[in-house]
Swiss-Prot record:
Keyword Amino-acid biosynthesis listed: yes
SMART domains xrefs: LeuA_dimer (SM00917)
Catalytic activity: pyruvate + acetyl-CoA + H2O = (3R)-citramalate + CoA + H(+)
Organism: Methanothermobacter thermautotrophicus (strain ATCC 29096 / DSM 1053 / JCM 10044 / NBRC 100330 / Delta H)
Entry coiled-coil feature ranges: none
MF term (GO), any: 2-isopropylmalate synthase activity
Highest taxon in the source lineage: Archaea
Record's protein name: Putative (R)-citramalate synthase CimA
Assembly and interaction partners: Homodimer.
Domain Pyruvate carboxyltransferase: 3-253
Keywords from the UniProt entry: Amino-acid biosynthesis, Branched-chain amino acid biosynthesis, Isoleucine biosynthesis, Transferase
């Protein structure tokens, strides 16, 4: 048995409060989800807006492997909009509960049934595959639900879907519910929401009951409490039930990160499968056990989903354990560099920060990149900034054994500091900042900040970076690190 996967990140997922994707962003996510292996991509709802249609058209024009689908109500206008986007199929959604019929549509069961049949026939006549979906099906009369599906199948629907729209199923009820719909003569899909935190469990129960397709979103994003998380469903199917999907499981982590970054909906650290702590272990018994045999505390390997294993360190770390971990990370350091890394790790630990492998690598790379002989050395930096104060910085540098004091203003404290440094160096070198990139490499307001910059001096461009808990100091140190590399190169070439 192989379960089909309909990814609805671009439709149901985009209904997450605060998420709005541009056509270009939707295309980038669709390309990634297609590479991931989803069978069907619900690209959006074509009737929504011209921008939405533009996004769907961009996706359909790519000739992707996946079937491209548009959400549609049982209204011909919705289907026409989908047809204009050249989609392969429509996810034709019809409310079926009396609650929805009375208070939302203000229609009778007979009227809704007629609409469902008419729009199914209309879409099929225009060469569009129909997946007929019952909204709020889990609060619907089962006889009416079966009637809608039977009539829809006779009208040409190739697949049917029963939506647990407000997430009220339990795994036991989910099994019984989908079992009761599995013999209607068309492939059945499960579509579960996460209002009680049961979307994944209910989806798995529905698939066990006879459904052959699951609707899910990357990271479980969606309105209210979200949808079934695609990564959790497919890994559970593979690992716990030995059921295959078309998903390339090794791409799950990178896909999750991309979607989180582009939607701005970041993951809780302990999110199953793709969270930063999903394979992280504190020092002690667990870490020791995992180092000896990973299966002692890991049900699946991080490599299976494209993730990595992490060991968290803090203020109790010793130099021996630190060196061992650096060796395991492939980083050979001299004793003096080790002590500087050790000092920084201890400092972060005293601030209440746990240091992960990502932190440690960033700190070590920063320390190993520090040159012994600096042309420019920072003596002092002072920043003044506020809502009624122009950001101002003063810096004291030692440049070739000369002390230089300068001040600068900018649009923010980082800009002011860089302006002051550039003014300090005007008599020594013409340095241009080409690129500036900042990233919080760990979560929280006390996150480590990784600053990467590109500097130009003449025809030479170099990159430099610094990692600090303080964005201003990280930016200043990255800038000066780059300046020192440029000027040191000139010295070695005899041009300075």
């Amino acid at each position: 048995m192989q379960v089909r996967v309909l990814d609805t990140t671009l439709r149901d997922g985009e209904q997450t409060p605060g998420v709005s994707l541009t056509p270009e962003e939707k295309l980038r996510i669709a390309l990634k989800i297609d590479a991931l292996g989803a069978d069907i991509i619900e690209a959006g709802s074509a009737i929504t807006s011209e921008g939405e249609r533009e996004g769907i058209r961009k996706i359909t024009s790519e000739g992707l492997r996946a079937e491209i689908c548009s959400f549609a109500r049982a209204v011909r206008e919705d289907i026409d909009a989908a047809i204009s986007c050249d989609v392969d199929s429509v996810h034709l959604v019809v409310p079926t509960s009396d609650l929805h019929l009375e208070h939302k549509l203000r229609k009778t069961r007979e009227e809704v049934l007629e609409q469902a049949v008419d729009c199914t026939e209309y879409a099929v006549d225009h060469g569009i595959l129909v997946e007929l979906s019952a909204e709020d099906s889990t609060r619907s009369d089962m006889d009416f639900l079966r009637t809608i599906f039977r009539e829809g199948i006779e009208a040409g629907a190739e697949r049917i879907c029963a939506c647990d729209t407000v997430g009220i199923l339990t795994p036991e009820r989910s099994y019984e519910f989908y079992r009761g719909l599995s013999e209607l003569g068309a492939p059945l899909s499960v579509h579960c929401h996460n209002d009680f935190g049961l979307a994944v469990a209910n989806s798995l129960a529905g698939l066990r009951a006879g459904a052959s397709e699951v609707h899910a979103t990357i990271n479980g994003i969606g309105e209210r409490a979200g949808n079934a998380a695609l990564e959790e469903v497919v890994v559970a199917l593979k690992s716990l039930y030995d059921v295959d999907t078309s998903i390339n499981i090794e791409m799950l982590y990178e896909t999750s990160r991309m979607v989180a970054r582009m939607t701005g909906v970041y993951l809780q650290p302990n999110k199953a499968i793709v969270g930063e702590n999903a394979f992280a272990h504190e020092s002690g018994i667990h870490a020791d056990g995992v180092l000896k045999k990973a299966e002692t505390y890991e049900p699946i390997t991080p490599e299976m989903v494209g993730h990595g294993r992490g060991f968290v360190m803090g203020k109790h770390i010793g130099t021996h354990a630190l060196r061992k971990r650096l060796d395991e990370l492939g980083m050979k350091v001299a004793d003096d560099k080790l002590m500087e890394i050790f000092r920084r790790v201890k400092t972060l630990g005293d601030m209440g920060k746990c240091v992960t492998d990502v932190d440690l690598q960033a700190i070590a790379e920063d320390v190993l990149g520090v040159m012994e002989d600096k042309v420019v050395d920072l003596q002092e930096v002072t920043i003044v900034s506020g809502n009624r104060v122009t950001p101002t910085a003063s810096v004291k540098l030692r440049v070739d054994d000369r002390e230089v004091l300068e001040a600068g203003t900018g649009v923010g404290p980082v800009d002011a500091a860089i302006v002051a440094i550039k003014k300090s160096l005007e008599d020594f070198a013409d340095i241009t900042l080409e690129e500036y990139h900042v990233d919080a490499i760990t979560g929280g307001t006390d996150a480590l900040i990784d600053v990467v910059i590109k500097l130009r001096h003449g025809d030479r461009i170099i990159s430099a970076r610094s990692t600090q808990p303080d964005i201003i100091m990280a930016s200043v140190e990255a800038f000066l690190s780059g300046v020192n590399r440029l000027l040191a190169n000139e010295k070695s070439e005899g041009t300075h």
